[in-house]
Design a protein with these regions (language model features):
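Conserved histidine-centered catalytic loops in small-molecule metabolism enzymes
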Residues: 194-202
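Secretory-pathway luminal glycosyltransferase catalytic domains
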Residues: 1-109
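Donor-binding and catalytic core of enzymes assembling or modifying cell-surface/extracellular glycoconjugates
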Residues: 104-192
Length: 202
């Protein structure tokens, strides 16, 4: 067994708050550990980041065809995060359906809604999603779901990193996110919020 006795140095973010000192003084050729979930980290290289996150050709082709078939070219992405949030609700609370109902009221009512979730079985049971305009993804694949999310012109986010990136990659001007990101055991989310998005109370 070969052991690297001189691993590359690394920097780890202390919290979800943007660290200006780390941003200005981080040396080259280090590994970064953390979420770095704020536009403040990369707004100056936004185009490069978007290019780095472009979908593989096969994924893009499959999702584009799927998106066109189920939506006709326009859709609202509605993301629900449940599984791990149910375990630690004081850190990441599960958002109530009332949040999604209010968010839906802000968008046109004749646009199809793609419901994306880590708990699609639960979504199928909810009366809110029984109308024909709601299409619940049962893909079971995180890449497919995020690709579909990024193609939607309207976004209704959960308090989730996965949701954040899906909405950000869509580059949509019509994004609704919850003001409530963390519970009482969580951190200050101020730098997670993207200024151009709209935020609703929960």
């Amino acid at each position: 067994k070969v052991v690297n006795m001189h691993p590359a140095p690394y920097k780890q973010e202390a919290s979800f708050t943007f660290d200006e000192d780390l941003f200005n003084n981080c040396e080259d050729n280090v590994n970064l550990y953390g979420y770095f979930q704020s536009e403040k980290w990369f707004s100056h290289i936004e185009n490069s980041i978007r290019k780095d996150f472009e979908w593989r050709d096969d994924v893009d082709a499959m999702c584009s065809q799927m998106f066109e078939n189920i939506t006709g070219g326009q859709a609202i992405s509605l993301h629900i995060r449940r599984t791990d949030h149910l375990i630690k609700p004081t850190y990441h609370p599960v958002l109530p359906l009332s949040y999604y109902e209010e968010a839906l009221s802000k968008f046109p009512s004749d646009i199809p809604v793609i419901v994306l979730s880590d708990d699609p079985a639960w979504c199928h049971e909810q009366e809110l999603f029984q109308d024909d305009r709601f299409l619940i993804s049962d893909s079971g694949d995180n890449i497919t779901d995020m690709c579909l999310m990024s193609m939607c012109q309207y976004q209704i986010m959960a308090n989730s990193t996965y949701s954040w990136w899906g909405a950000w990659l869509s580059n949509s001007e019509h994004v609704i996110a919850p003001k409530l990101w963390f519970g009482p055991d969580g951190q200050d989310p101020k730098d997670i919020y993207v200024k151009r998005w709209k935020y609703l109370d929960v």
